[in-house]
Amino acid sequence: RHDVLEDMLEEKYQEGSKSFLDFAAAYSTGRDDKKIEDLILKIYEFSRSYPDSEAWLESCVEAYRIPDVETLEKSSFMQKVMADIRKNLEDARELLAQAEMIALSPDGPAVYEATLDKDMLVIEELSAIRSYEKMAEAFTNVKWARIAANKDQTVLEEKIEQVKKIRELVKGIVKNISGQYFYESPQELVEDLKMCAPAMEELGNLVRLFGEKFEEQKRAQNIIDFSDMEQYALRILTEKSEDGFVPSKIAQEYQNQFHEVMIDEYQDSNLIQEAILNSVSTCRSGRD
């Protein structure tokens, strides 16, 4: 495998295309190409766990083809980002609900209720935003209310500390979201993606080329590994359609041949193994 990769990179250096040389200059250590080799192999191996590795690889490259903020907002990449943000905000909301229950419980710091209500309003307002650009602005301007002083001597100190600790956790969630996703403006993010796009395009091409050359070499030497068996099984048992992968005629014959299919350690299966299992299963066709 490493021999194939080294030979491929040597050929690319001899060809001397600007796109490759720019990529190599950006990602090699200067002394050797180990970093580039490791990157290609890592992405190649990861892509092989997907039923349509080519489509997955293209989707990764496509994520960098963002001309403007409007396109960024509509991208699948940004939809995943927004979903993750909303999930974290929901976690924050649940924490605040717990804090309010503690504050209003017997011997609890009820004086904190007003502050917790304001905190909840901050989280709810952030959660209601559907635009990444508007959310970036909102996170930049988040302001927390000062917590009221507790003067009730009957309140348990333990409950005071519990509420304060939960409140700090909530603030931490918001701070982490801001640091992870809003460290720069949407316009700056678009410019960064544009700058990285040529390198990612070249990386995708290198992964594809390596896959082709590696498969050719294994065929020439009559070598097959477990990952190859998965890929060949998928090609035999499925056909690609507009709706994704559907069972081939051969798979349909297996569906009629077997009454039950059992799989060991199902929780450890990957997406390609799931696709193979579904191809010979009758569940999707409504048959038990």
Where are these regions (language model features)?
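Conserved ATP-dependent motor core of P-loop NTPases, especially the RecA-like helicase ATPase domain
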Residues: 1-135, 224
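Conserved helicase NTPase motor core
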Residues: 2, 178, 182-288
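Short coil/turn segments at secondary-structure boundaries
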Residues: 14-24, 54-60, 102-116, 138-142, ...
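Short, structured coil/loop segments at alpha-helix boundaries
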Residues: 14-20, 75-82, 97-113, 153-156, ...
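Coupling/switch/interface segments within P-loop NTPase motor domains and analogous charged loops
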Residues: 14-28, 34, 41, 117-211
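Generic detection of intrinsically disordered/low-complexity segments and helix-coil linkers/edges
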Residues: 38-40, 50, 126, 133, ...
